[in-house]
Swiss-Prot record:
This is Large ribosomal subunit protein uL30. Keywords: Ribonucleoprotein, Ribosomal protein. Part of the 50S ribosomal subunit. GO terms for cellular component: cytosolic large ribosomal subunit. Belongs to the universal ribosomal protein uL30 family. The gene is rpmD. It comes from the Bacteria. One of its GO terms (biological process) is translation. GO terms for molecular function: structural constituent of ribosome. It comes from Bradyrhizobium sp. (strain ORS 278). Pfam families: Ribosomal_L30.
Length: 63
């Protein structure tokens, strides 16, 4: 697993006035403040979470 792909995402939107599931998804992605950047493994589960909150996050870098 030395060549494990990662994806870097940044939170660009606020979870205020969003559904509880979207707020929980942001927490699951380790995001809790606008401007925060996190690096996660590029798996189908993480991609699905990003799709769920695509209006609140942006992909910074894919390795």
């Amino acid at each position: 697993m030395a060549d494990a792909k990662t994806i870097k995402i940044e939170q660009i939107g606020s979870p205020i006035r969003r559904h509880r599931s979207q707020r929980s998804t942001l927490i699951g992605l380790k995001l809790n403040k606008i401007g925060r950047v996190t690096e996660l493994p590029d798996t189908p589960a993480v991609r699905g979470m990003i799709t769920k909150v695509h209006h609140l996050v942006r992909i910074v870098d894919e390795k």
